[in-house]
Amino acid sequence: THLLDENAVKEIINEVAKLCELSSTTTKVKQENWNEKWENNFEPVYINDKCVIRAHFHAAFTDIKHEIIITPKMSFGTGHHETTSLVMNEMFGIEFTDKSVLDMGSGTGVLAILAAKLGATSLIGIDFDEWAYENAVENAEINAISTISFIHGDADAIGDAIFDIILANINRNIILQDIATYVKAMNTKSEIIFSGFLKEDIPLILEKSEQLGLELVVSKHKNKWQMLHLKKA
């Protein structure tokens, strides 16, 4: 309860005050309709002239070929962030028809959903966060996509599966930690897109990629964020 939380905070303050001089103030935050605030601040995102990401309360975009409806809740992937935009734009230059796809760190599921709309027929999305997993399942249903299997887990969940295309919009540390697992899940013609890192991270990721038999297709950036598109050498 709020009362128990307040009492717990007071106990902590009292304990710390025994060790050093400490002053504190308490402010009650006015209750607000956070859903309304979120809706007021969530604007549709155009990835290019072929794709738009919107929320359920936006009007439909009948003039756009690929419309993706996302209810993000606590998950990452609305298209507003540079990394999501970078990966999605790059996806339009890849042939997805009848391909198998892995979306690592799937968040809202937006990348996997776009891959399905671009023609991929066998898709797996994996995220360690339970909120994200549940949200991705919900978003796939909203978009009438039934070809994606979402998994609550990490790279170990890949198992012995092999994919034509891997999307990993995560962060530098996880990419470096799990890249060997990703490469193991690639065939001789597979492609992989990494994002979620900065310019200074590129040498580390490229070095590890080349050690594992990958070669760079293209490197792109948006503001300070980077994207690497690689394939089997």
Segment roles from a protein language model:
Residues 1-62:
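N-terminal auxiliary segments of SAM/dcSAM-dependent transferases
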Residues 68-69, 102:
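Conserved beta-strand elements of the Class I
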Residues 74, 78-159:
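Conserved SAM/SAH cofactor-binding pocket of Class I
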Residues 52, 69-71, 86, 193:
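Conserved beta-strand segments that form the floor/walls of ligand-binding pockets within enzyme
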Residues 128-232:
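S-adenosylmethionine
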Residues 59-64, 158-161:
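Short loop/helix-cap segments at secondary-structure boundaries that form the rim of catalytic
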